[in-house]
């Protein structure tokens, strides 16, 4: 949500970092780290009293359980963006160049106040059913509309919402 907030002109509440550095490289560069999902390329870095989530750019294989990919592969910013849920969450910020990297149309959808799934909405919701609830939450909290194709897929898959654990919904 950091880049989404920046594009909306808001100060981000937290900063998640995406990089081409592999998890083991991140752990070598920073003395205080712990792995929360190293197999997914996610390391927590503790620095100057702050906690940063550092994720390696990745692409995912097929989702087998409605939540987790069967395998991940470290990849590029473009591939990483295309595996994400919604265009408004698929952007990166390059602090050196001072520019937003947007290969999925997130900036246009923010300007249009639209929640749109990246790629095939039905596939996005089948990968992780919680994304349906996230779409509704983003629309409500941000006062956005849900894109018609995304909405149609949400309605078509709504019966599978009961397969989401209560613990995940509370997260």
Language model features with spans:
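Catalytic cores of the polymerase beta-like nucleotidyltransferase superfamily
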Residues: 2-171
């Amino acid at each position: 949500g950091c880049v989404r907030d920046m594009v909306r002109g808001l100060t981000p509440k937290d900063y998640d970092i995406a990089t081409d550095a592999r998890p083991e490289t991140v752990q070598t560069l920073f003395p205080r780290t712990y792995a929360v999902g190293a197999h997914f390329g996610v390391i927590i870095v503790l620095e100057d009293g702050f906690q940063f989530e550092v994720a390696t750019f990745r692409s995912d294989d097929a989702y087998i359980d409605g939540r987790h990919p069967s395998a991940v592969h470290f990849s590029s910013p473009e591939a990483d963006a295309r595996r994400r849920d919604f265009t408004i969450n698929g952007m990166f910020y390059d602090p050196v160049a001072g520019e937003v990297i947007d290969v999925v149309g997130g900036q246009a959808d923010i300007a249009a106040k639209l929640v749109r799934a990246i790629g095939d909405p039905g596939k996005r919701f089948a990968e992780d059913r919680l994304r349906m609830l996230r779409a509704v939450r983003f629309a409500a909290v941000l006062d956005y509309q849900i894109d018609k194709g995304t909405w149609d897929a949400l309605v078509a898959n709504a019966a599978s919402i009961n397969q989401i654990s209560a613990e995940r919904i509370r997260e």
